[in-house]
Amino acid sequence: MKNSEKEIYFHVGLAKTGSTFLQNNFFPKLKGIKYISTHKYWRCINIIKRTNYKSYLISREFDRQFEFEVKKILKEFPQTKIIVVFRKHEKWISSQFKRHSKNGYHWSFEKFYNNENTGFWRKEDMLYSIKMDIIKKYSNNKPLVLRFEELKENPYSYLSKISNYTGSRYSKSDISLNVVHGSWSEKQLIFLKKFCSIFKKNPPEYYANNKILHWLLYRPWWLLFHFVMYFAYFLPKSYIIKKPLINKEYLSKSMKKYDNDWKKILSISD
């Protein structure tokens, strides 16, 4: 079979929109399509070229690498169709901040994201319309645009949209709706941030494409951070939390500017 005749579907995340659930609990259960797991993403192009399945599903969640990765896959397989999931901005940025906090970043939310656009997370990282423009730039096919909220509200409707789009099948009895990764509490994250501000000023580097360095230089810190958060579970809340991890009033005001961006997503979501 020619590569140009193969049907290819590319789930691009975003991160913190239920990607891990899909990658562990749903995509492997789909019938009638070859799923290339996130661990094999780095060689997915070679896998597709060297095998002869009728259709393939690739999955990997992106944030700042979004355009680079979309361009890379579409350059090799222009027929690729994109699956993208968005989440309300307020919930999404909160979840991103918590993810960075548990990975050793000990800055405040205001340094992570602020209205002056001088934080680690910038306005251009927040605009979903920019990501849709990137998809349109490289793909001539209509993407499947989903809302993370629907996964919570009506999971089987959400999952069926993916199976229908990809021409695959699944059985409800095969799907576990259990959360893959539970979230850490505010108390645990605050305690870890205090720990890192003293003992680990710079977060450990993540080696996505080097397993040896990943286990030698990143994984030990990952394990220590988890131990610290487990320890914090037993400490009094009043001892740890002097102020909220995220100021809700500040967050709400900061996210107002993205109301129209979210409305655009609602208007095109499937």
Regions from the PLM with identified roles:
Residues 4-270:
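Anion-recognition interface
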